[in-house]
Amino acid sequence: GYTDFDGYLEEAIPIHGVMGDSHGALYGQGCVNPGMIKATYGTGSSIMMNVGEKPIFSDKGVVTSLAWSLSGKVNYVLEGNINYTGAVITWLQKDLGLIASAKETEELAKSANPGDTTYLVPAFTGLGAPYWDSKAKAVVSGITRTTGKAELVRAALDCIVYQISDVVN
C-alpha cells in the first residue's frame, strides 16, 4: 500500500513494512539472533527474546508471537509484558508526593535502611506477565515504625527489578 499521511506529504509513499513498538525495539536494539533479549522500559515494560525461525511455546507465563518476517524468513519471540514499571515512579511523584522528580529516586533508595523489609507489589491494574491476574490488587507490606520515604522509594525501585526478574526467569 501507499500513504501520504493524511495529506501531510505531497506524494504518497509506499509502505514497506509495519511493526509494533516492542518488536521494533527488539530489531532496533540488534536482537536479531536467537537467544538475544531486550527490555524496554516505559509506563510498563516489555521483555522480549528472539527465539529464531521456529516458535517456542512456554508454560511459564510468557507468550509467543511473530517478531518479523524478512526475505521470506519468519522470526518468533517469547514476550512478557509488565503493567507497572515506570508508572510506579509516577505514582510516587504525582499520587503520593514523595518525590519531585524521578532523578531523586536513586539517592533516596541508597539512603534507605538496608534492614528494612518494605515490599511493593504494584498491581494497580492487575498483574501482567508472568502471572496474568487482572484482579490482583497492589500491596505494600513489611512496613515498620522506622519505614520512611527512602524505604518506600527503594521498595518501588525494587519492585521493578523483581517484575523483570519474574519474566526472565
Regions found by a protein language model. Give the residues of each.
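Glycine-rich, acidic and aromatic/proline-enriched surface loops and short helix-turn segments
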Residues: 1
